[in-house]
Regions:
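Acidic catalytic/metal-coordinating carboxylates
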Residues: 36-37, 63-66
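Acidic, metal-coordinating helix/loop segments flanking the phosphotransfer/catalytic sites
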Residues: 34-52
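Short amphipathic alpha-helix used as the core "switch/output" element in two-component signaling
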Residues: 65-76
Length: 127
């Protein structure tokens, strides 16, 4: 039986967060793709298959919410997990309204994120 590669895109303007998530994802058996901006992700999007996305809400330039809207409008939004370091009481509800599968405030437990990715990909593949 051949193992299925699960590509997980990470979009965060903090390079250290991208590196940490890349290591965690790789150690958990995922294939990480990291981007420091929404614009960089969009440039690469036609060439990559993304099974799940970890998306920072507050990016320089286009925000995570704006990127999610653009992907949804194009009909190409993978399951999205929003992350943020901002402690704003309205943000979790805004993230849910945007259609995310989960929302995590930094810092968050890595094992919970990995469980969420597995569940999101399994749910998407069962449809």
């Amino acid at each position: 039986m051949t193992a299925v590669t699960i590509n997980v895109a990470v979009v965060d303007d903090d390079a250290s967060v991208c590196r940490a998530l890349e290591r965690l994802l790789r150690a958990s058996g995922f294939a990480p793709l990291t981007y420091l901006s929404a614009e960089a992700f969009l440039l690469d999007r036609p060439r990559v298959i993304v099974d799940c996305m970890i998306l920072d809400i507050h990016l320089g330039g286009m925000s995570g919410f704006e990127l999610q809207k653009q992907l949804a409008a194009a009909g190409s939004a993978p399951p999205i997990i929003f992350i943020t370091a901002v402690d704003d009481p309205d943000t979790p509800e805004l993230a849910r309204q945007a259609g995310c599968v989960a929302y995590f405030r930094k810092p968050f437990p890595g094992h919970k994120l990995m469980e969420t990715i597995r569940s999101a990909v399994a749910a998407r593949n069962s449809n």
